[in-house]
UniProtKB/Swiss-Prot annotation:
Classification via Pfam families: MMR_HSR1 (PF01926)
Statement: the UniProt record of this protein carries the keyword Manganese: no
Top-level taxon in the UniProt lineage: Eukaryota
Protein name per UniProt: Genetic interactor of prohibitins 3, mitochondrial
Gene: GEP3
Amino acid sequence: MLNLCHALRGVRQFSCSVIVKVKCASCSIKLQDQDPSKPGYYTKPKSLPDSKLNPDLQDLKYLLFSQDIQLSKQAIQNDPDLKTKRDLLLRVICKRCSNALHHNNYNPEEFPESTLNDILNYVPRGSNVMHIVPFVEFPLHLDPNVLKRNDLDTTLVLTKSDQVFKDKNAVSKKVPIFMKQFLKNTLRIDSNKTFAISALKNWNISMFYNYFKNYTYLLGNPNVGKSTLINTLLQKYLGYKVKIDSTGKINSPSEEVMQEAFTNPKNFFKIQAAGVSHIPNLTRSVQAYQVGGKILFDLPGYSTSTSRLRLEEPIDERWLQRLRKTDLFNRKHIKQKTYESMKGTSQGGCYTVGGIFYLVPPKGSINQIVKYIPGPSKTFKNIEKGIDVFNSCNSSSGTHPLSRYCGIKSVICEKSQYKRYAIPPFIGSIEIVLKDIGYILLRTTGRYEFKGLHEIWIPRGIQVGIREPLENLIESGYQRYIETNGKESSCPRDRPIISSLYEMAPDEADTLNAVKKSYLEKTEKDLSARRFVDDDPYDLVQHLEKKKNPYWYYQW
């Protein structure tokens, strides 16, 4: 933690010489008032409204004025001492964060993405690392490159588990057993270091705290729950920000600051909290926290794909906030699993949530869909009709009768801006996962009969995958594991349980043979993963009860 007593001692004017020693309370970047084009810039006032105030307090007051978090004039007059200056400094945030957090006004280009190697520059070799992955979007966000590194001691932490399971019993007991066997079977990683948690529901937080070691780094993609986890730990264990100098010395808050933890705990936590936002890449620098007797480092998020689409480009701002704000997730869907029915048609009838994707079932199939993505759903005669309706919604400025169903911007105005994916054959239920968006459960009903492959059309640059329904998979696997005293694996070995999808040409008619061809290409260097390669595809899909999940293959 910055030693504010030292920073403010003898200061006659509030200037860059002081503010450079202060980090943005939101993104942890060092603050500066010299160059608006550089990170950490804050806006200085043009004039001083009250000459009675000391210059340094005036500047502090103005710095916060535009951010709607200034102290009242009475508070400053009654307490014009070092404590007031300290409190003000601790709340300072840069202009970029102020605009984004308080006015929802931000340019995605000001939130640049980082690579894994960029972030690992913050992490010394041999360090303890928690690889943070949102379980709700498993296996997306899981990075084998992190888990396989020999120069790091890595534990897998699965966040947002409350969006998958009804209660924490499965999270505590069943997930670690399943994941140990999944990692061994799928990635050849022998590790029993897995935790499933929910920071919002306080599931497994005490167990997590007891497990993680001193000087641990939280590593993962943007918006996977790192900062939310830190804030839960700060509240539970009276944690706070610290600053560690080049010699390794920990500079903790002053006694005055710590006293506020008891006199005004709400304000204390507000000052110490990690910056949580629906905006990706908000954190720009490493920030250390003292949590109980341990040091924990919050790292900026990293991206694994250079071709990844920024969701701000195609998706409406209000819809995007709903997608990203974890606390808005409605858990009644987990408990009730209310479904919508849809029959596949010869015209290519489709199901969509906001135009973010279009699911096209095969003709004659009867389907049930359980939606775990916020926003109302809508069915259309075909994709072209859906795109046409949403184009009209965008041009009508909200007056179109179907505007409430539109979650995309006018930039996605043609079918050519979507990629067509074929879903490999399945029987029963699957979950379709869209990265940074959420998932839906798709179930075919009635007696099994192959009628064709399901398709999903998604804007270019959005990553998608499928999995067997996760909660049922783990629950049934655990029961099998217990009944056989551990002789049977809780993670199936007879079939893949996750898969990437297969991109199809828009005019491809024989999607099943096209899927097999792509499958053989993808597994060319992974021959051990191949299954049913000698079977005729159309004979194979007649016997899915015995030959489950043909052509399923996940590309890490």
